[in-house]
Amino acid sequence: MPLEFSILDEFMKSWALRYLREAEADLSLAKECDSIELVKELSAISMRKAQLAIQYAFGDPNIMEYILEEALTKGSLRKEPLIRLIEKINILIKKTVDPQFTAGKDKILVLAEKTFEASSIIVKEALKRFSFVKGEKN
């Protein structure tokens, strides 16, 4: 009987998938809103949850936050694609909730949708790559 081996524990996997589901639900709610303030708020929440899903898929989100802060202050690892993506999502979240940001509902939703889609692909691929089936010992 094959055994499943995973670099990530079930706790991290379940949180990554949960945050993806919640990001999708918040995005869906944002699409139904008429108020631009609610659209901005729900879109930002959706993007943050999508970002957290990525962080859980790659390990402890607290460590990821620390690595991001180190990369931003010291410049080390700043060219790493995952660090750059998390940094860009942070910027996008801040921009979305900024009262000076005057984009319309459609543009905000496109930004949130693209963030969710990218996060979803990354999380699912990470979970697939970090789990594999190992045969039994004879």
Where in the sequence are the language-model features?
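Charged, low-complexity interaction regions
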Residues: 32-39, 100-102
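Amphipathic, well-ordered alpha-helical segments in soluble domains
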Residues: 19-26, 49, 118, 122
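Charged alpha-helical initiation segments
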Residues: 1-36, 138
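Long, charged low-complexity segments
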Residues: 2-8, 14, 51, 55-138
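Generic low-complexity, intrinsically disordered sequence content enriched
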Residues: 24, 31-33, 42, 115, ...
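Short, hydrophobic, well-ordered secondary-structure elements
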Residues: 36-55
